[in-house]
Swiss-Prot record:
It is found in: Endoplasmic reticulum membrane; Microsome membrane. Its EC number is 1.14.-.-. It comes from the Eukaryota. One of its GO terms (molecular function) is heme binding. One of its GO terms (cellular component) is endoplasmic reticulum membrane. Its cofactor is heme. This is Probable cytochrome P450 312a1. Belongs to the cytochrome P450 family. It comes from Drosophila melanogaster.
């Protein structure tokens, strides 16, 4: 009886392995145009991907991509899972627009305990419906209304930086700027002031940092990706504690806004998405839009529906923007000549009077400052890579993509590729000047991604970045803090960060 059972088990295993082998062989034939290093039976390229384990994973990943990408494409098997890496500019627009490639991969599920099914993680149908709801909250008309908030929060930031300038103490720039971006996104998109810039400590910011570390562990540990295993670890218990803090924060914001609307004597203004304020039509903010919206079933969105979008917009609005500001200031302290040129442009356009507000018309004229921001995003995109799941077979420029495979696009690879940007590791803002040669192709620079699932807040982000940086550079001179700060080490923890906090010093400008 034992040998019969053993024989049947062996037969079943053999049939399964035969099925796997035949399936992989068939897919390999269909995807033969994709360049690939030699693969081993059944495990595929796991022996190559294993090199990512260990210190400096970002550097290891960069070296692996540079070694195995040909014509900026590659095919890699992780066991029975197929990954297609495509960073060819000829493919980008089609890749990012193809209906079959609008689904995020299963890797993004590690965010779902926190972000649930918001715009960042949701499937195509839900994402499509929600995006249509919230897009008006980030149009240019709305951004112009946000300028007053950008100005107000920038002034608070200037006061905080001035304290460091007077004392001569070192500045943890990311910590300082994260409070600014959190306050700004909450007041503009959610209509609520949270005052983190005025607080000595932000429990929410600390919780975000901690949960990103846990999510990073799940992404890098194949066993932790399994929910059954992960729920039996201490990391899960800690994650639940952090989620309680994070969801409590956002639910508090939602309730506060509901109370404010209910108490508003002009509550009738919130009955449509085109309320009037002092006789001028305005679009409702992100949160107000959600509060008045309905789902595909015709019913109002639930508190959970609203919370998952609020969590997503806060994460995307404050963390990703803060890292960009952090890397920008790093570049400015590393290249004081560019910092001074930005400052002189601000003086020329906005004047030297520090008390004068900066208008959106002036912001639009700060061309060199924008070039420095773009150069920062090229070298240090906050999202170094993105991945999409093929929900059906498709073909992009004669390259077949089978259903079920994952397609990876890497903005950091493209931004640092010498084929697209000469001297890619040199900070050269002038490459963005009008008429500069060689001309930069739009599909080689995708820090906000491209196509249907591109970042809907990119114009918002650029205006906010330019305004706060114009204020900072008009008021202070920023300097690096020693050699350690010049030789910056990077870490990929969901978003791109520095291994050690970036520290600098500020000096008041007379």
């Amino acid at each position: 009886m034992f040998w019969l059972g053993f024989g049947l088990l062996l037969l079943a295993l053999s049939l399964y392995l035969l099925y796997v082998f035949e399936r992989q062989s068939r897919i390999d034939r269909l995807t033969h145009k994709w360049p690939a290093p030699p693969a081993l039976p059944f495990i595929g390229h796991l022996h190559i991907l294993a090199k990512l384990v260990g210190p400096h994973p970002l550097r290891r990943a960069t070296e692996m991509i540079n070694e195995h990408l040909h014509d900026h494409r590659a095919k890699l098997w992780m066991g029975t899972k197929l990954y297609l890496v495509d960073c060819n500019p000829k493919d980008i627009q089609a890749l990012c627009s193809a209906q079959q490639l609008l689904q995020k991969t299963n890797d993004y599920r590690v965010f779902e305990n926190w972000l649930c099914e918001g715009l960042f993680t949701s499937g195509f149908e839900k994402w499509s419906h929600r995006r249509k709801i919230v897009m008006p909250a980030f149009n240019y008309t709305m951004i112009k209304q946000f300028v007053a908030v950008f100005e107000k929060q920038s002034r608070i930031l200037l006061t905080n930086v001035a304290k460091f300038a007077e004392s001569g103490d070192q500045i943890d720039f990311l910590q300082l700027i994260s409070c600014f971006t959190l306050d700004t996104i909450c007041e503009t998109a959610l209509g609520v002031s949270v005052g983190s810039q005025s607080s000595a400590k932000s429990e929410y910011l600390d919780a975000v940092k901690s949960i990103l570390v846990i999510i990073d562990k799940r992404l890098k540990n194949i066993f932790y990706r399994n929910s059954f295993i992960f729920k039996r670890t201490s990391h899960y218990k800690r994650e639940q504690e952090l989620i309680k803090t994070l969801h409590g924060f956002t639910e508090g914001i939602i309730q506060k806004r509901i109370d404010e609307i209910n108490q508003d004597a002009e509550n009738r203004n919130y009955q449509s998405s085109d309320a009037e304020l002092d006789g001028v039509k305005r679009t409702l903010c992100f949160l107000d839009t959600l509060l008045l919206s309905k789902g595909p079933d015709g019913k109002p969105l639930t508190v959970k529906d609203i919370r998952e979008e609020v969590d997503t917009i806060i994460f995307g609005g404050f963390d990703l923007t803060a890292t960009t500001l952090n890397f920008f200031m790093y570049n400015m302290t590393l290249h004081p000549e560019h910092q001074q040129r930005c400052r002189e442009e601000v003086w020329s356009v906005c004047g030297k009077d520090k008390s004068e507000p900066i208008s959106i018309e002036q912001v639009r004229q700060l061309e060199f400052l924008e070039a420095c921001i773009k150069e920062t995003l090229r070298m240090y995109p906050s999202g170094p890579l993105t991945a999409r799941k093929a929900t059906a077979n498709c073909t992009i420029n004669d390259f077949f993509i089978p259903k079920g495979s994952d397609v990876i696009i890497s903005p950091i690879y493209m931004g640092r590729c010498k084929d697209f940007f000469p001297d890619p590791m040199v900070f050269k803002p002038d490459r963005w000047a009008i008429g500069a040669e060689p001309k930069i192709e739009a599909t080689t620079f995708i820090p906000f991604m491209a196509g249907a699932r591109s970042c809907m807040g990119q114009r918002y982000a650029m205006v906010m970045l330019k305004m706060v940086l114009a204020h900072l550079l008009r008021n202070f001179l920023f300097e690096p803090l020693g050699e350690r700060q010049v030789k910056l080490k990077l870490n990929f923890v969901i978003t791109l960060h520095t291994v050690e906090p970036y520290l600098c010093r500020a000096k008041n400008l007379d």
